[in-house]
Amino acid sequence: MKRKLVFATNNAHKLEEVSAILGDKVELLSLNDINCHTDIPETAETLEGNAYLKSSFIYRNYGLNCFADDTGLEVESLGGAPGVYSARYAGGEGHNAEANMLKLLHELEGKDNRRAQFRTAISLILDEKEYLFEGIIKGEIIKEKRGDSGFGYDPVFVPEGYDRTFAELGNEIKNQISHRALAVNKLCEFLRSI
């Protein structure tokens, strides 16, 4: 019997990406599947903290084993920014990927060091215990957007060892090499080991 796990996200892109990575290893439930329509605040100062806020909220309120992630783009020459604020980097209400990318590109104008990394932290609450998993992929920010697939900063991030952005590589390749894939694969290995 497959283990049921709630993935605490309302982000359809993330849900699709993680579902593709997990395959048939677990029965993945979304927040909609459990009738959770609460916007869980991400008020922590770290990716790990935000992931924990979401997973623990579901475990406390629904009694279901759950995992949640938070991802940040960390740019070396910007002191790790946008980091935990990646989804709302440009300010304003909601998540505006286009505005976030434009702000990032503007802040990097004239900078030679464009090294960056995507980092995903996953908090799993399983039978009252918390487990943390992390995935990191290094790369660089290019000067203009390229590609049509993916979401967020994918059109401006070129992972190390590649000459195309995540948005140009497409979901199949991205789902094998991304920061989220690395973290989710660690989660899968852990689930297989218990």
UniProtKB/Swiss-Prot annotation:
Keyword field contains Metal-binding = yes
Instruction: Fetch the InterPro entries from UniProt.
Output: dITP/XTP_pyrophosphatase, ITPase-like_fam, RdgB/HAM1
Looking at its record, which EC class is this enzyme? hydrolase
Q: Which GO terms describe its cellular component?
A: cytosol
Superkingdom to which the source organism belongs: Bacteria
* Cofactors named for this entry: Mg(2+)
One GO biological-process annotation of the entry reads: purine nucleoside triphosphate catabolic process
* Family, as annotated: Belongs to the HAM1 NTPase family.
**Protein name (database record):** dITP/XTP pyrophosphatase
